[in-house]
């Protein structure tokens, strides 16, 4: 790696440690020519994941869409931002563990609903109403009845 100060191509690693979240490694390097220090980060290169939408179009996986959708469903409910992030983490972990390069929105929705149901039933029904595209109050009531029957 070239030194950002003098562009020399060789350096030595002075310090190396994992970042707080463990997703990358932070390295302090010292240039062997000018002796100046700089920091680099090493991260695993991931394959981009495509999401297959209901209309069969494809777009790149965007974690922010999951978080934003959950924020709306959990608005004014006792669900923390940390819990929302954990659900998004679970979706990413599931996709990663199955080594998928493409995933449909149904699969993502199922993972979200399974996890959200454990945290807050009202948020679950709110999310389900959008995800499953409830057309009328009867569909809404069926979902609530199913939820109540399982409890």
Curated annotation (Swiss-Prot):
Cofactor(s) of this protein: Zn(2+)
Transmembrane segments: none
UniProt keyword Plastid present: no
Superkingdom assignment: Bacteria
Gene Ontology annotations of biological process type: negative regulation of DNA-templated transcription
Zinc finger (unnamed): 3-34
Gene Ontology terms for molecular function: ATP binding; DNA binding; zinc ion binding
UniProt entry keywords in alphabetical sequence: ATP-binding, DNA-binding, Metal-binding, Nucleotide-binding, Repressor, Transcription, Transcription regulation, Zinc, Zinc-finger
UniProt remark on cofactor binding: Binds 1 zinc ion.
ATP-cone domain residues: 49-139
UniProt cross-references to InterPro entries, sorted A to Z: ATP-cone_dom, NrdR-like_N, RNR_NrdR-like
Keyword Magnesium: no
Function: Negatively regulates transcription of bacterial ribonucleotide reductase nrd genes and operons by binding to NrdR-boxes.
Homology family: Belongs to the NrdR family.
Protein name in the entry: Transcriptional repressor NrdR
Organism this protein belongs to: Clostridium botulinum (strain Loch Maree / Type A3)
UniProt lineage: Bacteria, Bacillati, Bacillota, Clostridia, Eubacteriales
Gene symbol of the encoding locus: nrdR
């Amino acid at each position: 790696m070239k030194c950002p100060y003098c562009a020399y191509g060789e350096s030595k690693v002075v310090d190396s440690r994992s970042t707080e979240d463990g997703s990358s490694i932070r390295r302090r390097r010292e240039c062997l020519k000018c002796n100046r220090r700089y920091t680099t980060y090493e991260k695993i290169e991931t394959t981009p994941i495509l999401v297959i939408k209901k209309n069969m179009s494809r777009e790149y996986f965007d974690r922010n869409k999951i978080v934003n959708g959950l924020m709306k469903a959990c608005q004014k409910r006792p669900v923390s931002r940390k819990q929302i992030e954990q659900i998004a983490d679970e979706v990413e972990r599931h996709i990663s563990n199955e080594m998928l390069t493409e995933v449909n929105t149904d699969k993502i929705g199922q993972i979200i609903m399974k996890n959200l149901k454990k945290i807050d039933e009202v948020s679950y029904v709110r999310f389900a109403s959008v995800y499953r595209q409830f057309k009328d109050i009867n569909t809404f009531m069926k979902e609530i009845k199913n939820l109540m029957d399982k409890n």
